[in-house]
Curated annotation (Swiss-Prot):
GO terms for biological process, alphabetical: enzyme-directed rRNA pseudouridine synthesis
Chief location category: cytoplasm
NCBIfam families: PRK02287.1
Protein name: 16S rRNA aminocarboxypropyltransferase
Top-level class of the enzyme under EC nomenclature: transferase
Catalytic activity as recorded in UniProt: an N(1)-methylpseudouridine in rRNA + S-adenosyl-L-methionine = N(1)-methyl-N(3)-[(3S)-3-amino-3-carboxypropyl]pseudouridine in rRNA + S-methyl-5'-thioadenosine + H(+)
Organism name: Halobacterium salinarum (strain ATCC 700922 / JCM 11081 / NRC-1)
Amino acid sequence: MELHVRYEGDDDPEKCTARKLARFDLAALHRTGRETPAGVVLNPHAERALSPADDTDMLVALDCSWETAGRAMFEIDGEHRALPFLVAANPVNYGQPFQLNTVEAFAGALAILGRWERAEELLSKFTWGHTFLELNEEPLRRYADCEDSSEVVAVQQAYLDAGED
């Protein structure tokens, strides 16, 4: 599966997971929307959740600061899907739900799409990478067992409801 990143370059280059993926030839960076190929776009503002029904040969992520990640930033061609409830393991946003960096977003999407080994490959480039799969193993496996977006949303809601108890 091809991984493409619409790269804004507005965060710390030393902490940028997209740049590191590109250095290892695991993702391609694109500086403009026109350069970025259409695929399944991981978009936190999307109306539909990513599910195994979205299996594809190309994932696209936007790499930018969370401070600038408004809806307008995600004007990228393709089918837009939101990742369901997952918890960040990266040092910047550790423990924060939904505040994933680019490699975590790709890894979460790959796991949901049944490509667990590829997710592990990406995360192996980061000292904290294994922690992402450890923190999210149960929900990722449950999301991967879903048929479609509505089932993923139901599983997500169960996690959100459990957190309120």
